[in-house]
Amino acid sequence: SFRGGHRVLAFGDMLAVPGTEMSLAEARDRGASVDFFYNPEDALKKAEEEKETIFVLAAVGFETTAPVWATVVKEADERHISNLKLLTALKTMPETLGELCTAGNIDGFLCPGHVAVITGAERYRALSETYGKPMVIGGFTADLLLSAVARLVLAVNKGQGGFWNDYGSVVTEKGNVKAWERVGAFFEKGDALWRGLGVVKNSGVYLKEKYHLYDAGSRGLVEDHIPAGCRCGNILLGKNMPKDCPHFGRTCTPSHPVGACMVSSEGACCIILREEGVEEL
């Protein structure tokens, strides 16, 4: 973002994510060319209007956002927009859940309903059958979430495996086939690095060689430097609680996050700090 003729575009919640040296927000404060956008069409229009600038999109997410980025590449290709590139960190859940199943310290899984809308329930059903772990796809309203949690706790307490789709009003067995077909037209699977887990085979999504013009070097990404004492990796794996981290509520806060778990309002550390504070420290 400090390179002349380049501008980094990201969704607003990405700006505060700690980077190897600084966050995008901090880079912008120091004079880097960084901006946020609300939808991908904004980025496409900016690239069309400012042809002398290379726009690098921070394309981050899981199965839910991968179709969006596939559409961006499709539109850029059809509209002959050559000054727009994606720096991707797109990952898929089933492979990683499989990795977690082998870790041995997790008894059951509340599966992501929004991801299952795209992938379909069958991916999680297969995982449950393979590893003998109870898995429940839950919805996002209070009643659906509580129902899914209750079902999962009951299964764990009984020592049972099994799979349940408690979000059947939205999640089908096959998922959104057309959306995933679009992803497959522009992207391919590959190994990906996960914080706390290391490299997980075939859990990443990368642009195909045919569309390398739109790739800003995604396959060469390495894991960010993790500050000494940061417990984000273990928190994500369920091995530590946020309050086990020496940075929690002190040097790591929502306004100045040290680790990824404090960045989003949905992050474990941010939720615990908001709901429970730091009175026990």
Question: Where is each model-derived feature located?
Answer:
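Conserved mixed alpha/beta catalytic, RNA-binding, or beta-rich assembly cores of soluble enzyme
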Residues: 34-40, 90-94, 111-112, 140, ...
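Internal helical hairpin/lid segments
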Residues: 146-234
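General beta-strand structural signal in soluble alpha/beta enzymes
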Residues: 9-12, 34-39, 56-59, 85-89, ...
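Metallocofactor- and cofactor-centric catalytic cores in central/energy metabolism, strongly enriched
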Residues: 1-52, 66, 76-79, 87, ...
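Alpha-helical scaffold elements adjacent to nucleotide-binding pockets in ATP/GTP-utilizing enzyme cores
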Residues: 23-26, 68-72, 126, 148-152
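Phosphate/pyrophosphate-binding betaalpha-module
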Residues: 58, 62-123
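A conserved active-site cap/scaffold subdomain adjacent to cofactor or substrate pockets
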Residues: 104-171
